[in-house]
Amino acid sequence: NPESMMQLAKWCESEFGPVHLLFNNAGVAPAELLPIWQTKPNDWQWAFGVNVMGVLHGIQAFVPAMMAHGEGGRVINTCSGNGAFINLPSTPIYTSSKASVSSITEVLKLQLEQAESNVKVSILFPGPHTVRTKLFSAERNRPEELARDPNAPEHPISSVEDMLEMMSSMGIEMETTEPEEVASFCLAEIKKSNYWINPVNEKSEQAFKDRVESIITRSDLPNPNIF
């Protein structure tokens, strides 16, 4: 919530001095098995409350002080190619939330430039493959007031291992990326002052190219096959 983020910003400054790097990285993925027209408001409110409003609260709590101290800095918002570049039909809530993060990040960059601030912005796409985190078990942190519908079907995937096993049963061998690799790549790109922190994944890039081509040519939207 905004109050806790404001308190965190004040604590960071009192403990460590001026903040120069802000990583808005919290994210959740609800267990999605239903089409949009059957989803429940609680699922949307929980995902957007963390994935979108969490980014917004971080920006509003930290960026004004980062601009004021005049020493420069950088905001890094964690996004996903699923939402920023393509939209997977199996995850309507998650992909919609990450599309919002992409837009917020671009606008923040442009507005800081218009303000002639030396606070810069980057957008991070963890990868290049599925990252071994606990994102698939995010339901463990879901607040009671936004509880999942007890009648909703159980999702078969609650860990990266579950996903790997399911894809393997379909004849698809997925690769994974360790969080430490993402962190190292991110820091290296920050040193280069890059906006796009996006490791190379040829299948994802081809899916994005196909989508852009359909926009330019006004042709039918392609199926974003990234596996």
Residue ranges and their predicted role:
Residues 76-100, 105-106, 110-114, 127-130, ...:
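Catalytic loop of short-chain dehydrogenase/reductase
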Residues 59-60:
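A short, exposed helix-loop element centered on a Lys and neighboring polar residues
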Residues 33-36, 40-45:
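Substrate-binding pocket helix/loop in short-chain dehydrogenase/reductase
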Residues 1-7, 41:
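The beta1-alpha1 cofactor-binding region of Rossmann-like NAD(H)/NADP(H)-dependent oxidoreductases
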Residues 18-19, 66-80, 116-120:
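Active-site loop of short-chain dehydrogenase/reductase
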